[in-house]
Amino acid sequence: ISEATIALIDSLKSTTGAFGLAGTGSEYKIVTEMFLYKFFNDKFGYEAKRDPMHGERLSKAEKWDAEYDTFTEEEVEDLFSYLPHSVPRLKPEHTLSHLYNSATKGDFSTLLDATLVDIASLNAETFSVTTSGKSKVNIFFPLTTYVTDTQKRDEFAKSLMRNVASFNFEDVFDEKYDFFSHIFEHLLKGFNNAGGGKYAEYYTPRAIAQVMARLLVGENTDLRGVTCYDPSAGTGTLLMALAHQIGEER
């Protein structure tokens, strides 16, 4: 999965580079957001196929997302009511398959951006960041506006969709996988090699964070209601490692 992750990062980077965004802060935002969208899509499908009411219908279909496209609004709401609170919600028109099949239509960039914003709004209660002023910041924002030439935005959107279409997260849902650290480390290496700089020189690599987490948690297996606080958190790699070591349910 690590090799597949890096391959996908490089694929997305080839797209951002082709549209003049290589080595920019926008590139990191685009790569992480497309990763997260694909993660949401695959996680939703993975859990929906295990739903006690509709799971059999979806899992027996040749393509679960094509079958999901046939759901009525009532069936969609019913499915949502059975899914765990921690699972992202996607409407039929939000799935990657539905979007991918719409790529030949005009103004696809607007459709992709609107879909990402709609998913963020639908999942704002569970998946958002709260600022110190108690304002909520959504997890998805329009992506194609980073391309200044409006005539090229549709092709940019199509290219991003082609990049993520072949990647599958379902193999990692039964284990713990911090893909953000892979993205950050791989992009960071590229930035530093290209510019000769020392970006994020105080960043803690994922392997080191895992060792730190094991040392901090120790052999204590009777932990309950744990809260972790890292005042200097950047990518959250140490917090993720601690959560995995302790157990998210604790």
Region roles according to the model:
Residues 1-220:
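Non-catalytic, mostly N-terminal accessory regions of nucleic-acid modification and defense proteins
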